Amino acid sequence: MRKIIHIDMDCFYAAVEMRDNPALREVPLAIGGSADRRGVISTCNYVARRFGVRSAMPSALARKLCPPLVLIPGRMAVYKEVSRLLRAIFLRYTEQVEPLSLDEAYLDVTMSPCCGGSATLMAREIRAAINTELGLTASAGVAPNKFLAKLASEQRKPDGLFVIRPQEVDEFVRQLPLGKLPGIGRKTADRLESLGLYSCEDARQLGNEELIARFGKLGEMLAGRIWGHDEQPVQAQRVRKTIGVETTLASDVLDEAACWQVLRQLIPELEQRFSVSHGKEQLMGQGIKLKFADFQQTTVYRRGGYQPERFHDLLHEGLLRAQGKPIRLLGLVVGLPAAGEVNQLALDLA
């Protein structure tokens, strides 16, 4: 049986700012782009959350909800350095560390001799070290696999620890709403609910074969998760799959020509980024990202050799999906080869 710890820092960027400037601790604080330049909130402290401010919210809306909000652009170099120190703490307990972002990681401590092999005690020590050495707090979840460990870390936020022991997995998962499972978004949850499936117990009653027959690949994932199964390993070396660039527009646009003009200006930056590590002939595909004025988004991606002019065709398809909704953000992405994968330029899988 594996022992997995999920560590999630509490409102990380804002917490670093409050640590370094105590005057910010009791005021509503957010890190993000300027409201005057259509910025978006990256994170906020719990004081701001009481006003309804949330991550990914337009800064202008955050200002309306919370007029006294202190909005700062953030200090990415500082956050990266704190993240480096955070990782150093993790490595005292195991080499099997999979960072998900600057402030979140999985640790596989199955074979760790620390704390007599107790994952719970290791999680407690890690949280104490983060508080003592970095002046920050973290929430932790301990469970037999990754998806349960992540769910566990959400149970006692902020600054808490929750453990799901092997013998507790079935009961914990049984009552979970399906919408809480990783990979289940609002639309998928609505689809499941239309069939009378609200909880993992409901899905169990339907049966694995029926889930797979109705939902295909999604059903295969559900068939494992509703029983608490997840065999995904903690990946100490995560392979980057894509490289992209994006920009938020000064004002929403509808016109395809205007969108294409923006994308053409992004292409040189994209090519500069991927050329550091990959040649054009190595790329496995390309795509565009559109975010609409209502903050819904879509990505149009096609496998095959890199052709800059193809972005125009992808843009056209993306705008058809938009169904007249104004565009607030545009982005480009290219797919990188997996280890040992050969790009067959003549084969266009689009």
Curated annotation (Swiss-Prot):
Name a GO CC annotation attached to this entry.
cytosol
Q: Where does Mg(2+) bind?
A: 8, 103
Matches recorded under InterPro entries? DNA/RNA_pol_sf, DNA_pol_Y-fam_lit_finger_sf, DNA_pol_Y-fam_little_finger, DNA_polymerase-Y, DNApol_IV, PolY_HhH_motif, Rev_trsase/Diguanyl_cyclase, UmuC
Xref: CDD domains? PolY_Pol_IV_kappa
| Localization of this protein | Cytoplasm
Q: Which GO terms describe its molecular function?
A: damaged DNA binding; DNA-directed DNA polymerase activity; magnesium ion binding
Q: Which cofactor does it need?
A: Mg(2+)
Q: What is this protein called?
A: DNA polymerase IV
